[in-house]
Amino acid sequence: MKILALDLASESCSAALWQDGTLIGRDAPAARGHGGQLLLMVDALLDESGTALSALDAIAFGRGPGAFTGLRLAASVTQGLAFAAGLPVIPVSDLRAMAQQLMTPPDPAARVLVCHDARMGEVYWAGFVSIEGCAVEDTAEAVARPADMIARARSWLEAASAAGAGSGFAAYPALAPLGAQLARLAPGIRPRAREIALLAAHDGLGAALPPEQALPVYLRNDVAAIPAASALGPSGPRPM
């Protein structure tokens, strides 16, 4: 299976290519006009692998939650590439992708509590368990104030020990007592296309959707609609 993965949910821009068990990726700080930056990464990955866009099985993307502008742009780029090549899309939770980073050898965690700064005094959070080495949602993704998250997360942590991932633990001092309950803490973890590609390959084409359903998941309601495909910029995706 060949899957291209894209992510713009945080301050980073990343792309990855899963090709029959081999994973290659590109990561960089997101620059102004990062839709074009993402397309350059895609071109580089396809060139390195000797693969044409049309030869892929699907395009995966980080569907959120995360930075609103980045989510919209990632969905728009995904749609444009998928329509151009006649490919389906596979949406992957960015919180799940963060949990996956701590479920990967050499020291894989069995359970991960993800807490990502959502700004405006709130966090995105969810609990995940490892099943056959892949992150599976164990509590519903939510956006909440730190105090509300603590009340709900403590009961989940009582079941078994867990690791913690995400910027929320560092952004809100109120979460320090919760962080102290964790076996280990990785506040610097951000979503990456590598884990999105891995999880999409695990989920398979049964999770694939038509390109028009490449839509962000914000967990907040006060967000503008996805931009038109013209957000790709004047050049758009290269012909394949």
PLM segments and residue spans:
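Acyltransferase
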Residues: 184-240
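Surface "functional belts" at beta-alpha junctions
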Residues: 33, 88-191, 218, 223, ...
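Phosphate-handling active-site elements
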Residues: 47-54, 82-92, 107-110
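Residues at secondary-structure transition points
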Residues: 29-37, 68, 72, 76, ...
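Patatin-like phospholipase
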Residues: 8-28, 173, 184, 200, ...
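N-terminal beta-alpha supersecondary unit
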Residues: 1-65
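DPxDG-like acidic metal-binding loop motif
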Residues: 60-94
